[in-house]
Amino acid sequence: MNTSPSNIKKACLVFGALFVLSIPIVWISLFFTTYHGDLTRIGKWTEHDFSWQIPQPAIHSSLLQSSPIDQADVLVIGDSFSETLHWQSIFTKDQIKVTTIHWGQIDNICENFKDLLKQNGFKGKKIIIQSTERGFKNQLEKSSNCSHGNLFPKRLERSSKAQAPLLNPRLEFNINGQFTAGFKTILNSLAIRASDQYHFLYNYRSKSGHIYKIENGCAYFSNRLCEYGLFFHEDYKKPSIDANLVSKVRDINRRLSDYKVSWLVIPNKSSIYHRPVSSEFWEDLEQEKLGPNLYQLFQEQKILIKDLYAPNDSHLSTNGYLLIGTVIKKHIQ
């Protein structure tokens, strides 16, 4: 094989050029894939653009506790909005013991659920059932159609970590991120600044997260790109909660007739900031004293509490959690 010095030199130059070009590619892939919020993660947006800039209150770790069920005064059944134990801290601060069960830990609220509670030692008299607009109909109908359930968690005592008062979206080394995620993230950040029409193209292509311009967005959010809001794509594919579902709420309450039951149904972030929905369900819920009207409350409080929902996430901020904790505590008492 004839390899002249000139060919070797050319090969070295090509290899060297590829190596130099690969450095920024690898750097972007490794350092632009650290996400703190679920909407920045699925949508590939930077925390630099969408993390909040106003400090949130700190919750002491001693308040983020789920008690053993046989010691609990209050039982909470909920989803990811309850899993962090943030809003329950309003109760634990007043020495009220709370046990929190995730929907996925039980066979829904079946007809024999009251018996399961007694068998597992629950002596309290108050139950809070938390759900979100997005999943409420499915959870309620599954419970209504369930006559007998066996699944019940054996250990409920646990603790949680407080949300950071202020995120520091510095570059972090992350080898677990997808190799292309860094490119998509930095591309989105550059494109949204270069064109105020980019969000139309982004939403057309995205099947996970959506981004929309929000009227008076900077009055509601503190993040750097506060004129935009991040939301779940699926919110725009499903109708809101039908007011007729209140009858099924009453049916579930009859199953739990030995207890004082309050329903905490949290609106989707998109329903508060962007997507118009009917408030009739929440109005009926409040009128029949089944639960607070969080839709009306959030519409009022989003003006007073900047970052009521976290800009980078579909969940509430710490201020938002403390608000619903205060409201539901007052309602159930």
Placement of each model-derived feature along the sequence:
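Extracellular glycan-modifying ectodomains
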Residues: 1-333
